[in-house]
Design a protein with these regions (language model features):
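Terminal amphipathic alpha-helical/low-complexity segments used for targeting or macromolecular assembly
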Residues: 1-57, 161-173
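Left-handed beta-helix
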Residues: 56, 62, 67-68, 73-82, ...
Length: 173
C-alpha cells in the first residue's frame, strides 16, 4: 500500500485494477477513455486499446464522441463508426454494428439500451431512454422513450423507458 501511494496513489490503484481486470469489457472501456485524450499514460493507453481491440474484435475509435457511463455487456464483435455520437449511460451488447457508407453516422441519445446483434445504419437519430431489442435493424429515427424491435425496427410501445439502464452515471447539466 505504501508503494502504491508513493507511485501516485489512486491512479496506480486504478491502473492495477484495469491491468488485472477479470472483466475485459471494463478494461476495454478504461483504456478507451485514457486513449481518447493526451495524458501521462496516453501512449500506453493507445497500445492497450489497440491490443484489446484486436483480441476481442471491438472497433470503437478513441476519437469518437462518447458520453459518460458507457457499459459494454459482452464485449465481442462490436463495430462503431468513428463519427458516431453516443450520449450518456448507453448500454451496448455483443455483435453490434453502427455504420455508415456516406459519412453520416448515427446520433444516439442518453440512457439507451442496444441489444445483441443490432445494426444501426446511416443517418439515424435515436432518442433518449430508448430500448432496442436483439437483432433489430434500425434504419429510421427513433423517438424518445420508445421500445423497438424487428427488421426494420418498429416501435412496440412507450412503456418503461430505459428500463435496462441501471447504475446510471449522474451527469450535472
Amino acid at each position: 500500500m505504501v508503494e502504491m501511494n508513493a507511485w501516485g496513489g489512486k491512479l496506480v490503484k486504478i491502473l492495477t485494477v484495469a491491468l488485472s481486470a477479470k472483466n475485459h469489457c471494463f478494461a476495454y472501456s478504461f483504456w478507451l477513455r485514457l486513449a481518447s485524450k493526451p495524458n501521462p499514460l496516453y501512449y500506453v493507453a493507445k497500445w492497450m486499446h489497440y491490443r484489446l481491440s484486436r483480441k476481442y474484435g471491438i472497433q470503437i475509435s478513441p476519437s469518437m464522441k462518447l458520453g459518460y457511463g458507457l457499459y459494454i455487456g459482452h464485449g465481442v464483435a462490436i463495430v462503431i463508426n468513428s463519427g458516431t455520437i453516443i450520449g450518456n449511460n448507453c448500454n451496448i451488447s455483443q455483435c453490434l454494428t453502427i455504420g455508415t457508407n456516406h459519412n453520416t453516422p448515427a446520433v444516439i441519445g442518453d440512457n439507451v439500451y442496444i441489444g445483441p446483434g443490432v445494426c444501426i445504419v446511416e443517418d439515424v437519430r435515436i432518442g433518449n431512454n430508448v430500448t432496442i431489442g436483439a437483432g433489430s435493424v434500425v434504419v429510421k429515427d427513433l423517438p424518445d422513450n420508445a421500445t423497438v424491435a424487428g427488421v426494420p425496427a418498429k416501435v412496440l410501445n412507450y412503456n418503461n423507458p430505459g428500463r435496462y439502464i441501471t447504475n446510471k452515471y449522474c451527469v450535472n447539466s
